[in-house]
Amino acid sequence: LVPHAVDGSRRALQKVLRLIHPQVLRYCRARIGGGRQPTAEDVAQEICLAVATSIGSYEDKGRPFMAYVYGIAFNKVTDAHRAMGRDKSTPTEEIPEDSARDATPEEWALEADGSNRMRALLDTLSDKAKNIVILRVFNGLSAEETAEIVGSTPGAVRVAQHRALAQLRKTLQAAQETAR
């Protein structure tokens, strides 16, 4: 499918974008979260646009196409974080676009609370460690694929993941002990 998109097939490109969008959005939500400007959905859209405009120059060098996509995603999320640092405005509450889901207000609140706690926990990590955990744990990439994206070796990715998960475990245990 990707080679056809690279060769200029609009239909193949549409299919590729439909396939990558959920994974890109999940990555953006884990890195950016909700209630901020730009939103995870905005950044995911920018990533898909960047993939669409650059796919013609993509060369298969033996690594998975998603490594190429996550490389673009990493850069776009980094740009969004920089923009958030410069933007001192306070956004208003956003209306969820996924209102078709049949969830009660209580379920929405619990889901948002869990996402916020996970995001706060991930924010205790360095940017590189957070990115490794998101790519390996949330997106299910291999150590090799993650290493390509973050510019490291697979061994260093495994070590960083182990240390990051240990740090998260320690932070979570400390939070649970203070809550008692």
What positions do the PLM features span?
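Acidic, proline/glycine-rich intrinsically disordered inter-domain spacer in sigma factors
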Residues: 95-123
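Arg/Lys-rich amphipathic alpha helix in sigma70-family domain 2
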Residues: 30, 53-60, 71-92, 111
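Pre-recognition alpha-helix immediately N-terminal to the DNA-recognition helix
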Residues: 23, 117-120, 130-131
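Short, charged helix-capping/linker segments at alpha-helix termini
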Residues: 7-15, 25-46, 154, 178-180
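DNA-recognition helix of helix-turn-helix
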Residues: 129, 144, 148-177
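A short pre-motif secondary-structure segment
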Residues: 132-136
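Structural recognition of an alpha-helix C-terminal capping motif at a helix-to-coil junction
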Residues: 42-49, 63-75
